[in-house]
Amino acid sequence: MRKLAPFILLAAALVAGCWQSVSRPYRSETGIQPFAAGEITATGRDHKVTHYALRKITRGRYRMTQTDRGQDFGQGFELGFFALPGAPSHVLIYQAAALDRPASGDNLRYYGLLLITAPNGAQEIRPDCEKDARAARASGTRAGKDGACTFADRAALEKSLLDLWKSKKRPEYSYVLR
């Protein structure tokens, strides 16, 4: 049975304000793959629709690439999903790395929350360092010179993501697998 592969319009997350880590806290973890491969329709709060292809790759990860013709055609992310300790089972951490960057150890990883809403749906909560400063400070993390919140380790990241979940921030994107 096909399930949703909810996925992240992360191009905007690559700018200042995002939550990131260079320490790669999930490097040795196998991701959770709760979704089938397939075609994704993503809708933002502005009702703009973007289409992606999702496929499973090694180590419990996914590769998501944009299928709409245009400037970003073929660009995408490697995605991993992980349980968030202390949160309900339908709340997952997402980790995203841009495919157009080298796979070296210093490639930044971006983080947020994915809420599984149905067998074929999900929503994304994308943290912003400035707007979600209270949640980031839960682990003692503050904005750096580039405006992004860079977490020192996995424990700090998870503590702040749990605080973000508890803040009841509204999701910014919805995803449906077709």
Please describe what each predicted stretch is.
Residues 2-9:
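Sec-dependent signal peptide recognition
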Residues 19-36, 44-51, 56-178:
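Calycin-type beta-barrel ligand-binding domains and close structural analogs
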